[in-house]
Amino acid sequence: MARCGRLRAGTAAKLRRWRKGHSSDCNPETRRHRLAARSRFYSRPTEKSNLTVDAVKLHNELQSGSLRVERPSGSSQLPMEEGDAGEAATERSSGTFLSGLSDCTNVTFSRVQRFWESNSAAHKEICAVLAAVTDVIRSQGGKETETEYFAALMTTLEAVDSPESVAAVAYLLNLVLKRVPSPVLIKKFSDASKAFMNIISSQACSGSTSALRWVLSCLATLLRKQDLAAWSYPVTLQVYHGLLSFCVHTKPKVRKAAQHGVCSVLRGSEFMFGDEAPEHHPAAPSSAKFCVQEIEKAGGTKEATTTLHVLALLRDLLPCFPAAVLKTCCETLLRVMTLSHVLVTACAMQAFHSLFSAQPRTSCLPAELNAQIITALYDYVPSANDLQPLLTWLTTMERAHVNLGRLQKDLCWAHLPRLFSATMNCFLSPHLQVVAAAAQTLETLLNECIAPHMDELGNVSASTPAPGSYLCKMFRSVEEGLTYRFHAAWDGVLQVLEVFFEVCGKQCHPIMRKCLQSLCDLRLSPHFPYTTEVDQAVGAAVGAMGPEVLLEAVPLQIDGKEETLDFPRSWLLPVLRDYVQGARLGFFTSYFLPLAATLKSRALEFAQAGKSLESKIYDTLQWQVWTLLPGFCTRPTDVVEAFKGLARTLGMAISERPDLRPTVCQALRTLIHHGCGTDAERAEVGRFAKNFLPILFNVYSQPEEDGGSSSQRRSVLDTVRAYLTITDPQLGCGFLQKASEKLTSPESSEFARLSILDLVVAMSPYANEQALGSLYRTIQPSLQSKDHSMQKKAYRVLEEVCAAPHAPCQAFVHSHLEELQAVLLDSLKSAASPAKRPRLKCLFHIMKQLSAEHEPFVTALVPEVILCTKEVSVGARKNAFMLLVEMGHAFIRFGPTPQEAMERFLLLVYAGLTGSVTMISCTVLALTRLFFEFRDHMELNVVEQLLQNICLLLGSRTRDVVKAALGFIKVVLLLVDTTLLAKHVQTMLEAVGSLSDDMRRHFRMKLRNLFTKFIRKFGFELVQGLLPAEFHKVLVNIRKAEARSRKQRALRQAAAEAEEEEAPAQPKGDSMEEILADSEEEEEEEEERRRGKVRKKQARQKGQAWLKEGEEDEPLNFLDPNVSQRVLATEPSLKKSRGVKHDFQVSEDGRLIIHDEEEEVDNDEAKGVEEEVADVLQEVGLRSKKSQKRRFREEPDDDEPETGTYSQYRAGGSGIHRPLDKKPAFGAEYRSKKGKGDVKKKGQLDPYAYIPLNRAKLNKRKQAKMQGQFKGLMKGAQRGAKAGRKNRLKDRRP
């Protein structure tokens, strides 16, 4: 029990105490509720009102008419002369105080109209001024043009006195001035500038900055609109200098507005974009002089605030200055960088960077001045340990050299060797960012400064004079990076070498041979970690120099006469295979073919001697040599000269070497597609078609035992198709005639006839019309054949002929159109299931050529096409849907209108609803696809009738029909607008609600999916009210799932926002659109104030600098020209944290967001737009259902059933089979089977280490003991995590 009269311990500090002398006060200080209550009884307000004297004065003047819209004289020149507003009669209306705002017709003030709900006094003042000005313009018969608003606002600006009203008027003027015609502003420049300057002088020392900011912006816009002649008057420059003086103002917003205005004047004045624009703005020299004077005036003050402000201004203005004053500014920047003030140096470097990035004209930045700046910047190289300054220096030097290369290539190349040498020193930096930036800098310089001019050079050697000698020096600097002292950055060095080889390898290979040898030796060193990077670099050398140069520098050291089986450079073969292109085909014939023959003979010798291992090694080597052939056939340089010497060997390899057949066929296809760029090359390769095609025909016609596996036969057939594209048409027709003869020959076996038909399919698109007529008569009996394979391939021939774009094929189809229609109709019932896919494709191509007179033919096809939408073959179903859509397009072509045509077509399809159960389900599928494709051509009554018919079908007792009907409703729900669908929602839900119990159980997932979409579209209450009670439980579950999904998304979004780091400051825009764009950020004043303290703290931290002492006990020499490198922006005592950075997602309140691996998220709960589209595509047959995906992720044959009827069991495969080769997850034995988290198991260790919560352990005397226990636990956990990490790394290694 607590003592009477005393408070409980710990509460005294929480009580609020009276101030001395105020213990008798009983009324609270906060009177918010009293004031709210008083306002309801019409009492006079006692708080400060927004009604000011200036507002009343403005109101009285507006109402009395003394304040009139000032129209500029000489209105015949201006767009403001229509009507005489002075004589217009006015009439008081019952408009409200904001009538002029809410119905303002000028789009200039559309931004202001969102202020009327704001609680900000400044926003309310702006709205009041705009409403009053609009009212007075209307009262005088104005048309609310920008010029009228400008005149009224300028008059208002002179009439108001308070800073708030001045700020409001200036804000509106800032908006309207940008749209006022230039002649108006030129004519009124004197009056307007005088008014602005008076306000600026009166508001310069004011505590509020809003009025000053907007007036400065208005002044900048006014100056920007003046013509070139106006800038010859002293008054214009005087006004401009007034604006310029505020660029060093102490208030940040005022300074920002002035700097933005100065930039817009110098870079965006209208006369700068005319045909007779001057090279630079007339005010540019005086602006440069002002900046130099301000910097010199600031001198070496400690904070250098003014200097920083001027440097920020120069960052945007340097590209606008003429060359003479630009040189003075650059000299001033270099002098101020000697102060070793970290922020000043950084801002000066940013100014140089913006100068070079802007790529100014030669009149602004001559090449000589650019080169002088580059030379001077070498005196300001930061320390290798200073991260951010070094990155800035590298980027600036990169832009400087790129700009110099644009101005004068020779001068740029002369300066590049020194930069390469300095940049290579950055590879010794301990910071990975510096190493990556250095590598990126060198790669950019090579690509932008060197690569465009390499074609002008010949071969470069060590004795080549300039400019080739510069390349030698640059390459020597990079090559030095392969020494051991750069070993920590070898990956970056190898990337630079790769780019060097790509850019300069063709011309500079004589000086690169030693480097290639070093790379190959380096790769053979034990435990070398960068073998992939070496392979890429050597591959780049192969692509640029060619394999001949590489093998001269680095011999393959394989000749078939080795005494040992050690082939140290065999790794070159895969590199050559992946990177060789554009090489001489003759080199492969002269070097690699004899080598492959020698290796093959050596393999045979070892096989005969019983040495299987040696035989296998040499056989693999010769196979690797042959795999180089496709690369040599990619854009070879000597096809015409070299192919004839290689053709015979390739033909023998195809016919006699099944193991080489795929490689040789691939090489031939590559040569045809990517090596025959000219007519001469195509003619040379096509000349050997009479030799290659018979060989390929014979190989393909052989059974699989002799002709190879199915993949090899497919490769041979693809090669035949490729070769036919460059074969003489007469020769192709001869081969086609011979194939037709063998096809009808009784001596041909069934396999031979099927193979010949495959070849005929490949040859038919290239035949002439006479050969096609003969071929058609040959295959016509096969169209009625009972052999399904023959029938299918016969239809494939027709498909290729109908789809071919060549003139003979199109002429044949056009001349035989009636006959083809009759044949395809007669075979309606006799067509086998495998033949339906190509048969439907034939009909698809024929349908495109039909006209209105062929409508009976289309009508006769409708039932068959509808039934084919549920064929077993995936390809047949796909083609049936395509044909159905094409038939719809044909009816639209038939006319008379698309709506009537679709109505006639749907009537034909509706007939299927009266057929069998299968026909009904197929018809519903067809209607779903037709609605998806042609909903824009369907009348509203047609859609309503269609929907009613489908709803009736939901009462069917057949699952297939109900399934198809549910799919149609889903498509309608996703595609039709909510307003059109609202009057049918009751019909649809009543039809769905009337499903039988069996149907409801069977389609429970489909119904859940459908109800989710209904709830998302129409709301929970409406759907629940229209469905029977047995569905309510499902609806409640859906609502809970949707709410849970929304909550999880919100948590994920909050965690993602919490993880986002503060974005780095973006550089100011270089384009004129960005400079002249309105800044929305200026309106967020309160937010800026809140951020101010944080910025000041960061600025103080950034402004700190550290001085690096001399080595050992050596005193620091301040007269050393390199002393600036010892001024660091990074605290040297701070060491980089080596802790492991976790990537856990955290919500706003600090909770970890943990996702279980087995946690299944309902697809419909998290579905976005893409998932909804996927649902529609599945229902209309454009995408396979998720439940019907292929089990083995292979490309199936079109005629295989999609449901996997013929697939065989494979243990550990995909689908429902468990992954046998996957290791169990670590800790899986502790995982709970029902709930989440881990559970304890009897006889096993605890799944986690923990300290039990115990109140007794809060005793301070036992604090040291508890800390020791916790530290031991943490150390043990860290050791275990370290060991686990090592084990995971071992498991990942091959």
UniProtKB/Swiss-Prot annotation:
**Does the entry feature the keyword Repressor, yes or no?**
no
Q: Which residue stretches belong to region Disordered?
A: 66-92, 1049-1144, 1178-1225, 1255-1294
What Pfam families does the record tag this protein with?
RRP12_HEAT
Q: Name one GO cellular component term.
A: nucleolus
Which segments show compositional bias classed as Acidic residues?
A: 1072-1087
Topology in the membrane? Single-pass membrane protein
Question: Gene3D superfamilies this protein is in?
Answer: Leucine-rich Repeat Variant
Q: Cite the record's Basic residues compositional bias ranges.
A: 1091-1100, 1282-1294
**UniProt-recorded Gene Ontology molecular function terms:** RNA binding
**Membrane spanning segments where?**
905-925
Q: What is the annotated localization of this protein?
A: Nucleus, Nucleolus; Nucleus membrane
Q: Which UniProt keywords apply?
A: Membrane, Nucleus, Transmembrane, Transmembrane helix
InterPro entries per UniProt: ARM-like, ARM-type_fold, RRP12, RRP12-like_dom
Task: Please tell me where this protein is predominantly located.
Answer: nucleus
Q: Which family does it belong to?
A: Belongs to the RRP12 family.
Report the PANTHER family cross-referenced here. ARM REPEAT SUPERFAMILY PROTEIN (PTHR48287:SF1)
The molecule here is called RRP12-like protein
Give the species.
Answer: Gallus gallus
